[in-house]
């Protein structure tokens, strides 16, 4: 939707995580409803950092991204988005340069920029679709009430062979793992912007990281280790009995 697209344009923080082949790090210089300016690093070793600026006209669904300094300085990418229907959006992308480009290199610039923008857009579509799906799930979970105080997950020996097991419940999605010999459960949804935590691996420090923005959480307590957002939703308790694993929602 257009709402997700405008939300994505303002979200500078996702660049090194969703677009890891194009960016390795980013730090915000300033931001607001007008857009943002940030310093971004590239994966290529030895490449100079870029200062990027995105200016957004929310009323017109229009934004322009400019390379203020660093590789590609002076390049501008202007995007106009138009709604065709509730689920279809047409975008018009145009490339400009505030510095003169030799005529024999114009085609190369256009090809490189077109390929990179197509990749970035495809990666963003996955994020925007995932975000909308997560919002729909949250709305449904808010309406639901669990009729059971306990849910059977499955055979504990079989589950132990898997790195993780995702359990859908009427009130949320949870990930069940065996950590250091103990069964635990944690929310499979990031508390920041609802990023997916169902396919994450456990880091060496016992944390898990959101693939959208890199926010880290203690897998056992749910605490956000970056101090940037609230803790993960409280998970149900894991109970093992007679070779079976259960999620218990009893207090």
Residue ranges and their predicted role:
Residues 158-251:
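Rieske [2Fe-2S] iron-sulfur-binding domain
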Residues 1-154, 158:
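C-terminal catalytic domain of Rieske-type non-heme iron oxygenases
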